[in-house]
Amino acid sequence: MKMKITALAAAAVMTLAPITGSISAAAAGIPAAEHSSDFLSDCGSRAGYEYLGTMENGAAMQRAYDRMCEAAEKLWNDTGRGMDRIATYNTYASIPYDGLDYKSIGKVYLTFRNDFPLYYFADCVLVGNKTNFYMISNNSYVKGSTRAKAQQDITNYITSLAKKAEGACSDYEKAKIVHDAINADLKYAYDKNNNPSNEPWTHNILGACQKGEGVCETYARVYQAVLNYLDIDNYFVSGKADGGDHAWNAVRLDDGKCYYVDCTWDDILGSNSYFAKGEKTMSKDHVVDVPDDDPMRFFIELPDISATDFDPSKISKPRAKGDVNGDGIINISDITLVAAHIKGLRILSEEDKKYADVNGDGKINVTDLTKISAIIKGKAR
């Protein structure tokens, strides 16, 4: 089963002959949605930007990253524009090298892509001449009307998935709800020969938002986008699994540490075997890319990866109204404490008063006693 899971769709770098000098290339996909910069930032991350700043020529790399962000946001927000052509490619922005070499700016571009899962139109091809790096898009996304439809579909899908998790009390629960919802919605995409599909949309978020199927990039990018939207810190992870290129996620959970999640493998295996796993478990068959001289294998250093799997039993549950003594149970002990407070026999602490004032009127009286009693009897929540 695992042998059918592919890697990131990235073609090897090659040299072409454009208008001036030579153009280099490589290949894959990203998004376009509503005219809202807030939505873009809500679904994205700046983790890669921060890491690039720690590298040699970090300031120049961050400038290039910012220019790429600006260019992609402009294309997302302007569905009335087309794209230019350079050699055989569709381009929507040229980024000056600004002191960087081709490999360095390629690392910046792929880091930018990994931070922003919505940009389906940002192809994984690396193209540059002597003076500029070009941001390239697949033919499928040249028309503004196509991008407008894609953007609306992305917005609708991300927000609908996020709503399913909004009522959960912990980041672990939210991450699990989104994981399960994605795997209920999607199926792994194969071509007619039963090999992993290489259609552009199977390698970006549109596979989930429009088609209901995709390869590992689709699973990982939509998971990344929804968790970002829910303000759960996470990373798109690239590397190898069972010897083949693969993509998954690292998610920061309630204890402050990051854990790996592989929605793709869990979907194919019909299990939760790769949800909230630590380095010890995941390293048995997953190897994360590292900062490397090859742009196509370059990946930032991930922080705070737990060595062990997450233990959901250690999640501290939020204290409920009526739980006056904070023991996690609402019972006769809480009624006794409130009654003693009302009679002036034992005054509650300021913290405990917050949970004794069940109706939230700023007073602690017989009304609160009645409501706590109703909770105990199962007549109220």
Predicted region positions:
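Sec-dependent signal peptide cleavage junction
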Residues: 5, 16-34, 381
